[in-house]
Amino acid sequence: PSKPVQWVFTGVCLLIVLLGFLFPFSQLVYWAIKTAHKVIDASFGMIVVKSFSLAAGSSVLIVFMAIVLLYAVRVSGMHGMRYVTRIASLGYAIPGAVIAVGIMAPVIGFDKWLLRVAPLDGKLLLSSGLFMLLFAYLVRFMAVGYNAIDTGFQKAGKDINDASRMLGFNTWHTLWKVDLPLIRKSIAAALLSVFVDVIKELPLTLILRPFNFHTLATKAFDMATNEQIAESANASLIVILTGILPVVLLNRIIRKSH
């Protein structure tokens, strides 16, 4: 195409970036700077710590479960096992609110039964803490960790696994000494991907969070609901930056792997 046509296409692409990201992001930065003295305090710092701790814990749990499931398939050699484990990763296609409602009924029912069997000062042990929320994250984001780890195992292949077994290493020693080092980039990618998804997840957290428990996403939502649009920019900005930085790291991991 001619130079004018190239400039037109370049301008259209830049316009999309400007309207879709740079202008809204600049507005958020302006609001965040303007309202920082009213919003950022010790309680806001605790919300940041809780959000990052919850996301980190959920990431480790989900990636651990993905490794266990996929290694069970890898060791068993049964093709049917792969279809069974795939069921565990269907939650990503289901809306968060639906998962939340679906989890609440059985967990609360089990909690009430547990209360009758072993009374614990009248407290609902599982549904009053973070258990339901962590379990919901596990159901919702298992596919993210599962697919990343599955890719790593497929790239590693099974030949080196078989060679390790022939040299006398047992199953778990092979996993620890051979497989995990080979898929460490996939593990890092899975951890980062799940971390970002948990940080920005709203419906699940709103429905299943314990009383008076806030994350950055719920804090931004509450402020926006109360017409504190400018004040919500601080939490929103942290969520956005938390989503951007891992993407940059993931791109570096992918480039190095190629």
Predicted segments with their positions:
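Membrane-interfacial helix termini and adjacent extracytoplasmic/periplasmic loops
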Residues: 1, 40-45, 80-81, 100-138, ...
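C-terminal transmembrane helix and the adjacent membrane-cytosol boundary/short C-terminal tail
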Residues: 1, 71-80, 150-161, 165, ...
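Interhelical loop and adjacent transmembrane-helix boundary motif
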Residues: 2-6, 31-42, 199, 205-248
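Cytoplasmic-entry segments and transmembrane alpha-helices of multi-pass inner-membrane transporters
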Residues: 6-10, 68-107, 161
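Transmembrane alpha-helices
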Residues: 9-19, 90, 139, 146-149, ...
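Membrane-cytosol interface at the C-terminal ends of specific transmembrane alpha-helices
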Residues: 126-165, 190-191
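Periplasmic/extracellular loop-to-transmembrane helix junction in inner-membrane transport proteins
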Residues: 1-7, 25-61, 76-78, 226-227
